[in-house]
């Protein structure tokens, strides 16, 4: 009898402890505890789910508003005015997370100062065969070869038009929307693909991105060559200028980190010559640093995350110098902390983006980056984030 009572009490205790643990974990999930997400929840999810399934679920949960809202309140010192718009804070989500414009509002609630969707291609396409996304947890990195999988312009246009008035209010409130454009795999005239993207989605964007730097579409990076780039961007600008909208979107070009010195000079020359509004620096890299530890490090595709950080920052530094600081730069590649963000800003970026860090640290990383950035700005004597833009070039 005594044994049965003891066993029953033990079972009751386990239920109470288990239920309490579940409630506590639920509380930490809902409140967006940074350490809980980075050290327990995200690693556990990665053990359970393959990378692409995890990505799809993350987009779905974000679209349904099932992820924690940010608790960080943006201060005035984080505000940036660039590309013809106010940005409440300089930390955005890079293209690649919300490829089809399904989760825009949820991403703003996560605390991002701007959202960039895409890449969007004119016609729907499946992209490359699976598996096409690979984690390198030892390196805090991802290799992907998605290959511009896209729902196509028509579907994305319909999706964005349904929330057009909502976006207009968000933009006015300092939360702009960017749309990243790509070309179809089988297209023979890339310029026509990008021009069509401008015609269809330009009226719905605060800025457009001409993505000529993905390593996962054959021949795409050749569009970064001087003559090809000039021809392409001339056509894109003509289409943008012809849009019948009150506020025409800015046009930015997203470039690769794997460029020669001559490539960078040529891009800077064309951008300045044509009056391109900005650069996004950089896309993922095809290089594989010797420091990589992940078992899947040799998989083909673009490498993003921590191993890209310094290469991206150096490319920002060079492009800022080549454009004399007159072309706004969005810095992306390996941002997972306020220190990473500030290094890119000091190198010349007006805004920064992250993505891979979100897969390893979860939604709380957004508030963490902003909080750390604000503290570092104060520590280094900057009254506003805009005072830090290009600071390394003024030493």
UniProtKB/Swiss-Prot annotation:
Its main location: mitochondrion. The uncleaved transit peptide is required for mitochondrial targeting and proper membrane integration. PANTHER family: DIHYDROOROTATE DEHYDROGENASE (QUINONE), MITOCHONDRIAL, DIHYDROOROTATE DEHYDROGENASE (QUINONE), MITOCHONDRIAL-RELATED. FMN binds at residues 95-99, 119, 180, 211, 254, 282, 305, 334, 355-356. It catalyses: (S)-dihydroorotate + a quinone = orotate + a quinol. Substrate binds at residues 99, 144-148, 211-216, 283-284. It comes from Bos taurus (Bovine). The gene is DHODH. The active site is at residue 214. It is an enzyme of class 1 (oxidoreductase). Residues 31-395 are mitochondrial intermembrane. Keywords: Flavoprotein, FMN, Membrane, Mitochondrion, Mitochondrion inner membrane, Oxidoreductase, Pyrimidine biosynthesis, Transit peptide, Transmembrane, Transmembrane helix. It is found in: Mitochondrion inner membrane. Optimum pH is 8.0. InterPro entries: Aldolase_TIM (IPR013785), DHO_dehydrogenase (IPR050074), Dihydroorotate_DH_2 (IPR005719), Dihydroorotate_DH_cat (IPR005720), Dihydroorotate_DH_CS (IPR001295). Its EC number is 1.3.5.2. Belongs to the dihydroorotate dehydrogenase family. Type 2 subfamily. This is Dihydroorotate dehydrogenase (quinone), mitochondrial.
